Amino acid sequence: LDNGEEIYGKKGYMEAETFYKILGLFKLGKTEAFNVAFNQGTDARYCKEYQIFKNTPDGVFTDKLSGVALFDTRDRFNSGTGWLSFTKPVNGTVTEHLDTSFGMVRTEIRSKSSGIHLGHVFPDGPNGKPRYCINATVLDFQTREAYLTASSR
């Protein structure tokens, strides 16, 4: 809406970035999750969602806005950092971006489907693998059975 007039309805489409930001405001409100997703914020170490997600049963972590599976519990490990850590994402579901904020050079990870900020990837994972350090507030969890059932519909 622009001054009470529906703009996008007249155009007939909306850019994906705009759609997910509006959906984010609707689903996340003005929360830490919104700050993480759209302002490249970071969860507090050992946040409530991390405490819930660190010991989930077999399943997948999905993008809180698009529902796309991003990370698998089979690739999760305890890095001791206070953030969810994985050795890899689900194939083709994330994008990497150079991040030079705060005087550091890092690789930012975003959801390919919604574009939201997920976290960063570092080269210090187990057995020479990467460590995907992911903010829990922007994820949902589904058991493998529930995810496979829903995705087969």
Where are these regions (language model features)?
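Short, acidic, Ser/Thr-enriched surface-loop or helix-capping motifs
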Residues: 1-2, 112
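Non-catalytic, surface beta->alpha helical segment in thiol-disulfide oxidoreductase systems
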Residues: 2-24
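A short Gly-Trp-Pro
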Residues: 28-153
